[in-house]
Structures are given as C-alpha cells and as structure tokens.
Regions:
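N-terminal donor/sugar-recognition subdomains of glycan-related enzymes
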Residues: 1-125, 135-148, 159, 165-175, ...
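Glycine-rich phosphate/pyrophosphate-binding loops
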Residues: 133, 139-143, 147-155, 252-270
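Gly/Ser/Thr-rich loops at beta-strand to alpha-helix junctions
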Residues: 104-108, 132-134, 185, 239-242, ...
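Active-site-proximal structural scaffolding
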Residues: 129, 171-172, 181, 242, ...
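Active-site/ligand-binding-proximal alpha/beta "capping" segment
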Residues: 186-257
Length: 270
C-alpha cells in the first residue's frame, strides 16, 4: 500500500534532486523508484521511514550545535520572560472560537487574502508567521483591529532578526505577543524586544523520542523554575513556522477551528 506524506524542501534543494534523479536514469520514473534505488539497505523500513530517518539525521548534523548554543544564551531571558503555558485558557469562558494562521506563500497574493481579511469583521485570533508580519501589518491587519494578535518564530538562524526590522513592526509591537522557540537566535530576540513585544517561550520538539539523553528532555528540565514550575510547552513543528503556528493554535491556545492562508508547502509550476 502506498503512503503519502509531506516534507519541506528549499527550491534549490529540489532542483538538485531533480538533476540527480535525471543523471541516475530515473527522469521518467517515479520518486519512489528513485529513492528505493539508493535507500535499499536490507531493513524492513518503509520508504517513508527511511526518508524521515535521513532528513532527521541531516537536520541534527546541521543545526544541533546551534540549538544548544542559542538555548544556553537564551536561558536567562527564558527564566525572566513568559512561558507560553500562560496562554492556555483556564476556563471554557476563555476559549476563543477560531484562529487564522497567516503565511507568506504565493497563494496569499494570488487570492488577495490580506485585502479580504483586512476588510472583514473577523473576531478570532491572528497567528502570523514571522516572515509575513510586516506585509500583514501594512495590509491593515493590525492589533488595533484584530485584538488577539500573535507572531511566531521557530528558526534558529540569526537572519530571522531581519524579519523584525521594518518600522511598522515597532509601531504595533507593544500590542503583539511573540511566540518564540527556546533555540531562536539571541539576535532575533533582541530585535523582537526592541520592537516592544512581549515574548512567550516554547520548546520545539526535535529529538524527544531519545528519552532522557535528548536535548528536548534536558532543556525541558532546565527551564523549570520557581516562575515556570512546569517549564515551557513543547510542540511539534512540522519543520516550518506555518505548521508550528497551526499546531500552537489548537494545542496551546485550544482553538477548535484553525484556518490557514498563505501556507503553500510547495511551488507553482510557473
């Protein structure tokens, strides 16, 4: 039985894979046949399991040291700021009806979603990906109109700080709550605070399946303090901030309905 699944690739990586697939004589054959040609290792793993293992290995090798370094530098701020656990509704009366996650995929322009939303009477939560925030605010979708307004960053790279440098973000920053991964760059954190935002920390799950030897377990224990006796909430990310925001919407904020715009997870043929 075939299995369908999704994973995130940069466009440059996809192009390299297409070229390599053609060079190996698999241009007109399925992706499954190509993957099986070099993943066949006499184990009982499915193709899906093999790919997940390979991409996990690549991710850990590329980012593990950076996660540890960023976490250690963030620890003082984590202990002094908010845990995203504080955002969990305490009573049924606190439960909002819906949330809308906003990404920056090309479909958001194709379907004119920002203009439609800015003119709407939507009363639910706004959950912006960091990359979409400036354009969302410029489109008139601001915390002045949409009161329950969040932005999220999970990526570890220092370049994410540029997403918070637009002057319009500082204009509205003190009305926006930022959901930030404990492994985010401290430089990104500084830009977020300069914009006037309150930070609510989370853990992003990467290796929790490894038990007490995992980075997730160790960092989870280290963030349990008198102020945060239960530590930080931890979420699966799906490998990107849009999926992370969607998961955060129903696991932490407890929304029963979470909509998506600008979350494409792919490329148009043109």
């Amino acid at each position: 039985m075939s299995e369908e699944f999704l994973f995130e690739l940069e466009e440059s990586t996809l192009k390299k894979m297409l070229k390599r697939k053609e060079e190996m004589g698999y241009a007109k054959k399925s992706w499954n046949e190509w993957f099986d040609s070099f993943l066949n290792d006499n184990k009982t793993e499915s193709t899906k399991e093999k790919l997940e293992r390979i991409f996990e290995k690549i991710t850990l090798e590329k980012y593990y040291d950076e996660w540890i370094q960023n976490f250690s530098l963030n620890l003082d701020n984590i202990q002094n700021d908010h845990s995203a656990r504080e955002l969990i509704p305490q009573t049924n009366d606190d439960l909002p009806s819906s949330a809308l996650v906003i990404g920056r995929g090309p479909s958001i322009k194709k379907h004119n979603h920002l203009e439609i939303l800015s003119k709407s009477n939507y009363k639910g939560t706004i959950l912006c990906s960091d990359g979409s925030l400036a354009n969302v605010l410029k489109a008139g979708i601001t915390p002045d109109k949409f009161k329950n307004f969040f932005v999220m960053t999970i990526d570890t790279q220092e370049r994410q700080k540029k997403l918070y440098e637009d002057p319009i973000i500082k204009k509205y920053g003190n009305k926006i709550k930022c959901i930030l991964s404990s492994t985010a760059s401290p430089h990104t954190y500084n830009k977020i605070k300069e914009a006037g935002m309150e930070v609510y920390w989370i853990h992003t799950l990467v290796d929790y399946n490894k038990g007490k030897n995992s980075f997730n377990y160790i960092s989870g224990v280290m963030t349990k303090t008198e102020k945060h006796p239960k530590g930080l909430p931890a979420i699966q990310t799906g490998g990107n901030v849009g999926t992370s925001a969607w998961i955060f919407g129903w696991t932490v904020l407890k929304h029963s309905h979470v909509g998506l715009i600008g979350i494409d997870h792919g490329y148009y043929s043109n």
